Design a protein with these regions (language model features):
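Pocket-lining segment of extracytoplasmic ligand-binding domains
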Residues: 94-95, 174-264
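Bacterial N-terminal signal peptides
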Residues: 11-25
Length: 334
């Protein structure tokens, strides 16, 4: 008995539907395979890193074909993880210079803040940097941007760090403020929004370091030379997401302050506004790493090879340059 025309059509339809779902499944698996995983960090709970947070919050990494595991890891720890190949792209300050001087194949691939964005606050009785002679200045950790900035400013005031002014390392901004309040330090270096907390604690701004416009790697993005070479496309996609995060940070103030509040666990309107206005000028459309900023770090590095080292050795702006030449950045702002 021959099958009816209707049953043949039904069988054919069943086969076609089955083939469709097979194709969809294969296609989905192929797309999933194309999504590269990138392990990255942000260095602090500071508004400076809003572009990175926005890239995660707005799914920009996904938009550019990446699955990014972005988490808080302190810069020194992140640098060691990068060297050990446990992170791919990190968010350091001067740690890359120190690692590079020790022979590690690491490079800055983009700037986040290419100058020191911070202030020195001191007890009310201290009127100038010169008054810090014989006193104690608190910074975060050795080799961090606060450490470099302190040394630059003290030398500008003709004071020798470690001799005329004792430097102590208290790890974080909150700990620095606590150290001053407890009498363990006379002054400290702060970034926003801890600057407002310092004011509320009765401390006086001694130096607005930001206004000094000191070229310095306050924060950057970095990787290994091997990663930039072997996974260049992944690094490019990461930077594209970051650049779009910068664009949003610069143009969507209310949303950016909301994201800063989310990550810093801050709801105070004044704190959020202060953070946004502090870091807005530092978010550059094309954040190339300047040689002058690295040179400042070399000038104050304790490593014997620092004096003869060339700042360009620690920089690879090539991916950003390629992105810019493609017209990507201009299109973002149209």
């Amino acid at each position: 008995m021959k099958p009816s025309e209707e049953s043949l059509r039904f069988s054919l339809l069943t086969v076609l539907i089955g083939m469709f779902f097979v194709c969809v499944t294969v296609s989905s698996r192929a797309r999933a395979a194309e999504v590269a995983s990138v392990r990255a960090n942000y260095a602090a709970f500071s508004g400076a890193f809003a572009p990175l947070w926005i890239a995660a919050d707005r799914n920009l990494f996904t938009k550019y074909g990446l699955n990014v595991d972005l988490r808080y890891i302190a810069p020194a720890t992140a640098t060691q993880a990068l060297i050990g190949k446990n992170l791919d792209i990190i968010n350091p300050g001067g740690e890359i210079v120190e690692a590079g001087l020790n022979g590690e194949p690491v490079v800055y691939i983009a700037g986040i803040m290419n100058r020191a964005v911070m202030s020195i606050y001191a007890k009310p009785e201290i009127g100038s940097l010169a008054d810090l002679k014989g006193k104690v200045l608190a910074v975060t950790v050795p080799g961090a941007t606060t450490d470099f900035a302190a040394r630059v400013l003290l030398q500008q005031a003709r004071l020798t760090p470690g001799k005329d002014v004792k430097l102590i390392y208290l790890k974080g901004m909150v700990e620095i403020l606590t150290g001053i309040n407890q009498g363990n330090a006379d002054a400290g270096i702060f970034t926003s929004p801890t600057t407002l907390k310092a004011q509320h604690a009765g401390l006086k701004e001694l130096v607005n370091v930001t206004e000094q416009n000191i070229p310095m790697i306050h924060a950057a993005l970095a990787s290994t030379k091997d990663y930039v070479k072997s996974r260049r496309d992944d690094a490019r996609r990461f930077l594209q997401a970051y650049l779009e995060g910068i664009k949003i940070s610069r143009t969507e103030a209310d949303y950016t302050k909301q994201i800063i509040g989310k990550y810093t666990k801050t709801t105070d309107v004044a704190d959020l506004e202060n953070s946004y206005q502090t870091f807005l000028p530092a978010w550059e459309r094309l954040p190339l790493v300047p040689a002058a900023a690295v040179q400042t770090m070399l000038n104050f590095a304790s490593h014997p090879g620092a004096k003869s080292a060339k700042p360009e050795t620690f920089i690879d702006n090539s991916i950003l340059v390629e992105i810019d030449k493609s017209g990507f950045v201009d299109k973002l702002y149209k």
